[in-house]
Amino acid sequence: LMIDCYMALDVPYSIDLANAVKEANLFWIEEALPPHDLESHKHIKRACPWQKWSTGEHTNTRYGFRNIIRDRSVDILQPDLAYAGMTETLRIAAMASAYDLMVIPHCSGVYAYNFGISSTVTPFNEFINLHPTAEKIVPIFGKIFTNEPVPVNGEVTLTDLPGFGAEFNDEVELEEI
């Protein structure tokens, strides 16, 4: 179980939240603070050492992650592959590896899955279910790909096709996207 705060908290509230949910044993609290407020991140991490903290969906280059990594101000880095791209995210992961930090992309789909299997610091990937009622699992990219993998019993099977292993659906109309 994780909580995403979308940069909405301050230091006292972050600490109060971590204390209030301590018994829930959350895997992480995500983006409690703006990603570049490193001093505040270090403060909440020191105040609540049992809690893993994550950030990164609004930081999309290795240069933005450099100080976050060096200062160890969070436990988990979450670049968004849709913005950072595969090459830059692999560079971020290489930097994180030297500090024993996890990288769990803030996105789902073929890009994140392929990154996950190529990274030694990514123990799992997120899956964000975009079905309107969440009653079934649907492809992240809708009808754009003909063979986009979706999780089955918590696992994703990737193809051995070139690139990201997904084939574009030539039949899809722009209005459907």
Positions of the model-derived regions?
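Conserved hydrophobic beta-strand within the GNAT/NAT acetyltransferase core sheet
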Residues: 1-5, 31, 55
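Loop-centered beta-sheet repeat module
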Residues: 1-21
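Hydrophobic/aromatic residues in well-formed alpha-helices
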Residues: 14, 41, 172-173
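Shared catalytic-loop signature of beta/alpha-barrel
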Residues: 19, 25-28, 36-155, 159
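Extended hydrophobic packing segments that form well-structured cores
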Residues: 162-177
